[in-house]
Amino acid sequence: MPPAEGGGMEIIMLDKVNKDISKQRKYMNWNNMLLHLEALYVLDNALTEPEDDDLRLIRKFETDNMIKYIVDNGAGDKLTVLFTETAVLIKGFAHENSLNQFAATEWNQGIIDMMYEGLDEKMKNLFTDDERQETTFFIWYDGEVHQNKIEGNDGGRWLLGYAFDTYERFEEFARDYYDMEFDNDLLRKLYTYSALSELELSKLIQGV
């Protein structure tokens, strides 16, 4: 018996959700960050024209054993979140923070090295030397949260807000950043599952 009209799209959507769930089970996660960053990536990717690639808010890189998201707000601040099977690595760079060595009177590599102290060398090497230099805070989660704060300075943890721990924060940001109103049900579905069918995504980015 052929599937009911629209059934094919539902099957594709279900398959996408199942694959995303499988990824979430494969990789270490913290506060559903993987789900929420993927939702932001899907939305930003759909709303960014190819010719405006340099204006993307978030980029995604994936290998067989790692998923990495880089959020760049265009104002000099970056949040990089890297998911592996055993840890979540979170690197923040808040350019106005006093721990920004590029703005320091004298470069102090020891400050940066201290942020990564205690992290397995293999994990540390997932970032290049240049990437590590662009750090004002570093957190890793392996079942427990680790952060080496420098003199009580959190290094700009406000950047973690881009992982949107509540739908309300995600919705407010999306509305303000993209300057448009979204269908609330579809946007909530995207936030909850990090996936929409092509038809749903097309409808979402048309706004209301």
Named regions from a protein language model:
Residues P2-P3:
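Intrinsically disordered, low-complexity segments enriched in serine/proline and basic residues
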Residues V88-L89:
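Alpha-helical solenoid scaffolds in large eukaryotic transport, assembly, and signaling factors
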Residues F93-N100:
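Short, solvent-exposed aromatic-acidic interface loops
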Residues G6-G76, E85, N100-V208:
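N-terminal domain-onset segments
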